[in-house]
C-alpha cells in the first residue's frame, strides 16, 4: 500500500485509499478546473474539501503542501519514477496531469498554443475577473472610490474581447479541447455568481457565450463543477 504519511496534510485530511490521487480543493473556478480535468481523464482520485477559511487554508497541515495557502493542491502517489509528488497552483497541476496521461495538451504547435492560452488565463483572465468580483459583488462592493471597480470591469471587458476574437472560426482556443479551455471556462461561468454579465457586455460576445455553452454540455464538466461538494 502506498504510504503518504510523509505528507503532513494527510493528518488533517486523511486518505481513505492512499493509492489514489488526493485532491485538496473547493469548487471555485480554480478548484473546478482541476476537478474537471480529473473527471475528463477518469483517473481514480479522492477529493477533500478545503474551505477558504483560515482554519483550513492557513492550517499548518495545508501550508505544508501549499505555502501560498490557496486551493487547489494534489498529492499523486504515482508521481515521476513511481514516487509520490505534491503539487499546487492549478495551472501547474493541469500541465502535470496532461503530461502524465498524454491527454488534453496536444503535441507540436497545438501544445504550445494550449500552453499560451493556459498562461493567458492564469496571468490575466483569472486575476482580473477575481478582482472584479471582489469590487462588484464581495467585500470591496462598499468601497466608495469607483476607480478600482472601473479598472477591473474595464479589464474584464478587454479580456472578453480578446477571447471573442480568438474564437472566430474556433470551437476551442487551441483547436482541440484542452486544459486551456478547462482553465478559462469556469471563470466565464463565475460572471453569473458575480452578477456582472451586463456590466461587462456579455451579450456583445456571442462566440464566448457559445463557447461556454459547449463547455457546460460536457458530462465531465457537470460532474467536476461540484467536486468537492460544498455541503
Task: Give short role names for the model-derived ranges.
Residues 1-147:
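GST-like domain detector, emphasizing the conserved glutathione-binding G-site
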Residues 98, 187-188, 225:
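Active-site-flanking alpha-helical
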Residues 64, 217, 226:
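Phosphate-coordinating loops and pocket residues in cytosolic domains that bind phosphorylated ligands
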Residues 222-231:
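C-terminal helix/juxtamembrane-tail motif
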Residues 118-217:
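GST-like fold's C-terminal all-alpha helical module
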Residues 51, 179, 228:
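Short, solvent-exposed turn/loop segments enriched in Gly/Ser/Thr/Pro and often Arg
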Residues 92, 207, 220:
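Residue-level recognition of oxygen-bearing side chains
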Amino acid at each position: 500500500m502506498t504510504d503518504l504519511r510523509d505528507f503532513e496534510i494527510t493528518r488533517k485530511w486523511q486518505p481513505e485509499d492512499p493509492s489514489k490521487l488526493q485532491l485538496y480543493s473547493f469548487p471555485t473556478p480554480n478548484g473546478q478546473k482541476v476537478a474537471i480535468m480529473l473527471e475528463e481523464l477518469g483517473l481514480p482520485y479522492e477529493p477533500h474539501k478545503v474551505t477558504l477559511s483560515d482554519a483550513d487554508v492557513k492550517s499548518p497541515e495545508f501550508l505544508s503542501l501549499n505555502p501560498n495557502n490557496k486551493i487547489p493542491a494534489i498529492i499523486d502517489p504515482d508521481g515521476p519514477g513511481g514516487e509520490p509528488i505534491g503539487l499546487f497552483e492549478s495551472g501547474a497541476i493541469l500541465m502535470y496531469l496532461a503530461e502524465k496521461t498524454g491527454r488534453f495538451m496536444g503535441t507540436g504547435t497545438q501544445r504550445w498554443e494550449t500552453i499560451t492560452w493556459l498562461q493567458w488565463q492564469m496571468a490575466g483572465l483569472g486575476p482580473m475577473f477575481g478582482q472584479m468580483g471582489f469590487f462588484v459583488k464581495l467585500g470591496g462592493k462598499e468601497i466608495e472610490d469607483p476607480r478600482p471597480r472601473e479598472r477591473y470591469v474595464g479589464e474584464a471587458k478587454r479580456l472578453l474581447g480578446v477571447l471573442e476574437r480568438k474564437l472566430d472560426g474556433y470551437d476551442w482556443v487551441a483547436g482541440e479541447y484542452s486544459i486551456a479551455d478547462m482553465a478559462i471556462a469556469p471563470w466565464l461561468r463565475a460572471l453569473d455568481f458575480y452578477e456582472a454579465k451586463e456590466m461587462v457586455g456579455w451579450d456583445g460576445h456571442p462566440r464566448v457565450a457559445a463557447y461556454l455553452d459547449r463547455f457546460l454540455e460536457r458530462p465531465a464538466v457537470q460532474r467536476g463543477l461540484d467536486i468537492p461538494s460544498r455541503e
